[in-house]
């Protein structure tokens, strides 16, 4: 459901975000040892925290108060997800992106390095792998 939202208008995305939050929180409560539940909640917070000013302004017109995301809360969810499943490359990608957003660039690079050491098991994770490699190469070029 969440993947479909990415291509919808902002109104549909915000409405869908509320549904995703509710069901994801229920999943975390019912499956507290499932790393993917924490990953989903981390992405939920990341994406809402990363919502542009224009989109957030539009969301405020449509809704009394749009859902609030937080990079710090996303960080907690991603760290918990990795604690429970240290072999899932997707969480390393999102944790690294979150570190970048909060200005912890060295931590982001360290997480990306750990992530690229894992083998990408699925096509979507292959995209995460390639993006992390690209970021690391760009950083290496800056150093030289």
Task: Name what the model sees in each region.
Residues 54, 116-144:
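Terminal, low-structured helical/coil segments at or just beyond the last alpha-helical repeat
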Residues 1-4, 41, 95, 102, ...:
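Structural register within alpha-helical repeat arrays
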Residues 3, 47, 101, 135-138:
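Register position in tetratricopeptide repeats
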